[in-house]
């Protein structure tokens, strides 16, 4: 029987907290750059978004007649008052003529031939959006460190914003093996889409060795080859070209993941299994990307009660998929997360390393999948 002496082995599991703490001192934010707003979805702002005054002059918030409110003071159904010489028909969004300060709605106007009369009073400013009412230079629309959302990309052009200053890490993805199995393909596609959603500029290298040798990225994620299989050598390849900080991380799934550096570039090696790759992204990858972008991970969990108990091993940080219904979260698996569990789930919960799990009925924070 042949004994393999060069196989990759995990000597110890590094706590997740230690991995995340190492980011703070070892990883710096990338340089900011200007980019068209339309291309910045998910990116982290490197400067406040300061708008010009918007609108630059008062505009109508409703269809009607622009008037000087004082000229029709006291108008009513039994005391109609003719509109003044400054009155003018305007549509929503139209600029108010000089000398007017309110909009009389059409249902408060009585037309008598070619004469328009107000049958209700309006207060100054009623039906009007003042200059700077949508946005003013003194108030940032979004601040440095915040992530741009789809709503921001829709609203900011209306305030005159065409470009923004962002930090968008260049992230390279590389397979550790030439094999193109469905599961490995799924892991790569998932990580690529997660990274793009997180504001990264993603490229795909032809091989892990090539990606480790080139310096055209800010960070690298290698997929597959982190275990002790006969063809697994991703960690050894990293050791040859850089340094391995940790091989084996106390997370589940994904415990064969590794972290290291080539020069100052961080390298995250994730298992080729879809569930493990996804868990490593959730627990480590997105924090790495957020540090490079000068932002932070922002979860907006929903608090639900656990339908049945969850057990976990002390010392391991665990990702558990859950299905949500009737205000309850039902755990769908642990350790190995099947494709069925992943696709049927509505989100995931985190079991921290210091916990043995949660009892049935416990309140848990359900996070959305990326």
Where are these regions (language model features)?
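N-terminal intrinsically disordered, low-complexity, charge/repeat-rich segments that act as generic
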Residues: 1-26, 191-199, 228-229, 233-241, ...
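Phosphate-interaction motifs
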Residues: 2-161
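Flexible glycine/proline-rich
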Residues: 33-38, 46, 60, 135, ...
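Structural motif
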Residues: 65, 79, 87-88, 101, ...
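Glycine-rich beta-strand-to-loop/alpha-helix junction loops that act as flexible
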Residues: 92, 175-177, 201, 219-237, ...
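Short glycine-rich, flexible loops that bind phosphorylated cofactors or substrates
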Residues: 150, 228-230, 276
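Glycine-rich phosphate/diphosphate-binding loop of Rossmann-like nucleotide-binding domains
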Residues: 155-216
């Amino acid at each position: 029987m042949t004994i393999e002496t060069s196989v990759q082995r995990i000597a110890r599991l590094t706590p997740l907290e230690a991995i995340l703490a190492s980011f703070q001192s070892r990883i710096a934010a990338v340089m900011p750059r200007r980019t068209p707003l339309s291309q910045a979805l998910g990116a982290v702002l490197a400067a406040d978004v300061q708008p010009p005054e918007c609108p630059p002059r008062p505009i109508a918030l409703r269809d009607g007649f622009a008037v000087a409110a004082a000229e029709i003071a006291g108008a009513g159904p039994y005391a109609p008052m003719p509109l003044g010489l400054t009155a003018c028909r305007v549509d929503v969004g139209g600029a108010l003529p000089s000398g007017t300060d309110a909009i009389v709605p059409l249902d408060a106007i009585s037309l008598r031939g070619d004469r328009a009369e107000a049958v209700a009073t309006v207060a100054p400013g009623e039906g009007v959006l003042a200059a700077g009412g949508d946005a003013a230079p003194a108030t940032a629309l979004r601040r440095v460190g915040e992530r741009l959302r789809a709503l921001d990309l829709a609203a900011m052009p209306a305030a005159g914003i065409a470009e923004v200053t962002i930090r968008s890490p260049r992230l390279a993805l590389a397979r550790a093996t030439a094999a193109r199995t469905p599961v490995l393909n799924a892991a790569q596609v998932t990580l690529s889409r997660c990274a793009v959603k997180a504001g990264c500029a993603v490229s795909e290298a032809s091989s892990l060795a090539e990606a480790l040798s080139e310096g055209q990225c800010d960070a690298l994620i290698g997929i597959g080859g982190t275990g002790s299989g006969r063809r697994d050598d991703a960690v050894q390849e990293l050791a040859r070209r850089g340094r391995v900080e940790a091989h084996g991380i106390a997370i589940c799934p994904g415990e064969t993941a590794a972290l290291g550096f080539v020069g100052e570039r961080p390298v995250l090696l994730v298992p080729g299994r879809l569930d493990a790759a996804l868990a490593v992204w959730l627990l480590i990858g997105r924090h790495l990307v957020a540090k490079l972008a000068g932002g932070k991970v922002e979860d907006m969990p929903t608090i639900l009660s656990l339908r049945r108990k969850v057990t976990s091993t002390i010392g391991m940080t665990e990702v558990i998929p859950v299905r949500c219904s009737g205000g309850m979260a039902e755990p769908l698996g642990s350790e190995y997360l099947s494709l069925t569990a992943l696709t049927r789930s509505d989100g995931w919960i985190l079991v921290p390393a210091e916990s043995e799990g949660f009892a049935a009925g416990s309140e848990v924070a359900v996070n959305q999948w990326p």
